[in-house]
């Protein structure tokens, strides 16, 4: 038998977590901004954490067996994470998606062998979330031994981030954390990580980054193009009282944020990361220099080549926001 070093894992799933952190010196020279590179998880996003945590919890407690058919509504990243883990564990999976899913994400999910159900009709808020949920309910009623991941209401979602990235952040950052800035959709990541951070840094301010047109914090619903941030419903796992500030960012600002990050730091990240960069740029205009800001970069940029990294898409979003060309 070959003796393995500590760096050699038994399974790809063992490489989920322990993502690196980097300081964004060039982009934010007057503040200490630390970014956790969640896109370096094996499935390419922070969604590997809840996918692994929820499935392994279900298996441990007998809720998921070899005959179980996993069902989930997803804009892409959780679908990829679930598809990866389902393939490794030999489970069946159906992902309910909508037309806003990036073409790359859709191809990856299908490459893992997952079933895909595409909804076409938007819901009353102009998004597709409620339509996707209705399709999930239909599948649950017709598929034997179906198990709904239900990321918007599943307490295991935020717990995965509490025990995962949240714990890793407080173990890495030894100085007081002034601000924790995170994007919201299911709100699992901001709820879980902030709860762990507040245990160690009780004075940390929790800043949620939401999409303009998302209804999570009561904004008026409008059409949104960028997947993976915002929602057309309020997640059950959200506790608004734990959020100190909300910054809304539009699709155009998010795309500019992505491009600034790659220009200044060489980091090629996804659309919600651009939202974070734009939000931090707003935040630092109202705080003292030298603040310690911690954030997360949720997913990889190569999944958004047809969106935030497309000049055609950028011009479309620019026109929609009424930004005048120079």
Swiss-Prot record:
Against Pfam families, the record matches this protein to: PALP
Origin: domain of life? Bacteria
Q: Which EC number(s) does the record attach to this protein?
A: 2.5.1.140
Reactions mediated catalytically: O-phospho-L-serine + L-glutamate = N-[(2S)-2-amino-2-carboxyethyl]-L-glutamate + phosphate + H(+)
CDD domains, sorted: CBS_like
Q: Name one GO molecular function term.
A: transferase activity, transferring alkyl or aryl (other than methyl) groups
Subunit field text? Homodimer.
Query: Record's family?
Result: Belongs to the cysteine synthase/cystathionine beta-synthase family. SbnA subfamily.
Key word Transferase present in the record?
yes
Induction cue: Up-regulated under iron-deficient growth conditions. Repressed by Fur under iron-rich growth conditions.
> What pathway does the annotation place this protein in?
Siderophore biosynthesis
Put simply, this protein is called N-(2-amino-2-carboxyethyl)-L-glutamate synthase
Could you tell me which residues carry N6-(pyridoxal phosphate)lysine? 47
Task: Write the record's keywords in alphabetical order, separated by commas.
Answer: Pyridoxal phosphate, Transferase
Its gene?
sbnA
Q: Its function?
A: Catalyzes the synthesis of N-((2S)-2-amino-2-carboxyethyl)-L-glutamate (ACEGA) from O-phospho-L-serine and L-glutamate.
Q: Is Transferase a UniProt keyword of this protein?
A: yes
- PROSITE patterns to which the protein is assigned, alphabetical: CYS_SYNTHASE
Biological process terms in GO annotation: cysteine biosynthetic process from serine
Residues the record lists as binding pyridoxal 5'-phosphate: 77, 185-189, 272
User: What InterPro entries does the record tag this protein with?
Assistant: Cys_Synth/Cystath_Beta-Synth, P-phosphate_BS, SbnA, TrpB-like_PALP, TrpB-like_PALP_sf
Swiss-Prot/TrEMBL cofactor(s): pyridoxal 5'-phosphate
């Amino acid at each position: 038998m070959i003796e393995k070093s500590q760096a050699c894992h038994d399974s790809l799933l063992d490489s989920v977590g322990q993502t690196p952190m980097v300081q964004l010196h060039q982009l934010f020279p007057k503040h200490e901004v630390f970014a956790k590179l969640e896109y370096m998880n094996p499935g390419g996003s922070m969604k590997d954490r809840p996918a692994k945590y929820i499935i392994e919890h279900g298996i441990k407690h007998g809720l998921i067996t070899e005959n179980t058919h996993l069902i989930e509504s997803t804009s892409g990243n959780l679908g990829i994470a679930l598809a990866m883990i389902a393939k490794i564990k030999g489970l069946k999976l159906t992902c309910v998606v909508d037309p806003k899913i990036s073409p790359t994400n859709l191809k990856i999910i299908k490459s893992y062998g997952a079933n895909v159900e595409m909804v076409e009709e938007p819901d009353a808020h102009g998004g597709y979330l409620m339509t996707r949920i209705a399709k999930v309910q239909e599948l649950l009623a017709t598929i034997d031994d179906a198990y709904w991941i239900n990321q918007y209401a599943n307490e295991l979602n935020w717990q995965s981030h509490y025990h995962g990235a949240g714990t890793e952040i407080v173990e890495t950052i030894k100085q007081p954390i002034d601000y924790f800035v995170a994007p919201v959709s299911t709100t699992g990541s901001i709820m879980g990580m902030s709860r762990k951070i507040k245990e160690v840094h009780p004075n940390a301010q929790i800043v949620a980054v939401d999409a303009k047109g998302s209804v999570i914090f009561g904004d008026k619903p409008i059409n949104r193009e960028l997947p993976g941030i915002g929602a057309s419903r309020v997640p059950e796992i959200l506790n608004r009282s734990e959020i100190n500030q909300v910054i809304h960012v539009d699709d155009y600002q998010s795309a500019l944020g992505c491009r600034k990050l790659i220009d200044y730091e060489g980091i090629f990240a996804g659309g919600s990361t651009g939202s974070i960069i734009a939000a931090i740029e707003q935040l630092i205009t109202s705080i003292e220099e030298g603040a310690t800001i911690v954030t997360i970069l949720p997913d990889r940029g190569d999944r958004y080549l047809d969106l935030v990294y497309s000049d055609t898409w950028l011009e479309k979003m620019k026109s929609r926001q009424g930004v005048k060309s120079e």
